[in-house]
Amino acid sequence: MSLSIDVTGLPSISSSVYKNESSSTTSTISGKSIGRSEQYISPDAEAFRKYMLSKSPEDIGPSDSASNDPLTSFSIRSNAVKTNADAGVSMDSSAQSRPSSDIGYDQMDFSLNKGIKFDATVDSSISISTTSKKEKSKNKNKYKKCYPKIEAESDSDDYILDDSDSDDGKCKNCKYKKKYFALRLRMKQVAMQLIKDL
């Protein structure tokens, strides 16, 4: 009996999504102008900015980040400060705030670039074969050795020593001696046969 399954290929799945959102905000945390680009996942940058401005600085935590991925998440601290209505929540790494001024704005450029492409191809082969094991079991029975049968009897009068011999410590008139030597000879023959078979 043979069973064979071949899977030569599966349909490939590919999709690409490209979206670019950018907005510029200003911050007055540091005294120098820095241009940076942050990537995040958000359906609407303007809606996210309004949501963040509507919250109290004490209520802003890591869960308000647009993404939990360290590479694309915002650097929002639990003690984030709000600078002004135009700047929104500060993304600067400094935890200390500085009085607002008209100089030294940090330029924040938020952009979203997302692309997904998935291609899967599977090549596999499964083969199962079975054979009958009855023939092997029959062959094993043919080579089975037949060893000489050893007969043993329960305690009878011929196997029990006389009471008179128990005091001497030696077997002078022992009815069991003849049976013992016959049994020992048979055991020796069985042992020799086993050694030859091995």
From Swiss-Prot:
GO-annotated biological processes: viral genome replication
Region Disordered, annotated ranges: 13-37, 52-72, 86-106
Keywords (A to Z) from UniProt: Glycoprotein, Host cytoplasm, Magnesium, Metal-binding, Nucleotide-binding, Phosphoprotein, RNA-binding
Modified residues (Phosphoserine): 67, 154, 156, 164, 166
GO cellular component, one term: host cell cytoplasm
Cofactor(s), names only, from the UniProt record: Mg(2+)
Biased composition (Polar residues): 91-100
GO molecular function: ATP hydrolysis activity; magnesium ion binding; nucleotide binding; RNA binding
Pfam families linked to this entry: Rota_NS26 (PF01525)
Compositionally biased residues, Low complexity: 22-37
Protein's cellular compartments: Host cytoplasm
Location, primary (coarse class): host cell
Entry comment on modification after translation: O-glycosylated.
Domain of life: Viruses
Residues that, per the record, bind Mg(2+): 92
Family in the record: Belongs to the rotavirus NSP5 family.
Subunit structure: Homodimer. Interacts with VP1. Interacts with VP2. Interacts with NSP2; this interaction leads to up-regulation of NSP5 hyperphosphorylation and formation of virus factories. Interacts with NSP6. Participates in the selective exclusion of host proteins from stress granules (SG) and P bodies (PB). Also participates in the sequestration of these remodeled organelles in viral factories.
HAMAP family xrefs: ROTA_NSP5 (MF_04092)
Record's function text: Plays an essential role in the viral genome replication. Participates, together with NSP2, in the formation of viral factories (viroplasms), which are large inclusions in the host cytoplasm where replication intermediates are assembled and viral RNA replication takes place. Orchestrates the recruitment of viroplasmic proteins such as capsid proteins to these factories. Participates in the selective exclusion of host proteins from stress granules (SG) and P bodies (PB). Also participates in the sequestration of these remodeled organelles in viral factories.
Protein name, UniProt field: Non-structural protein 5
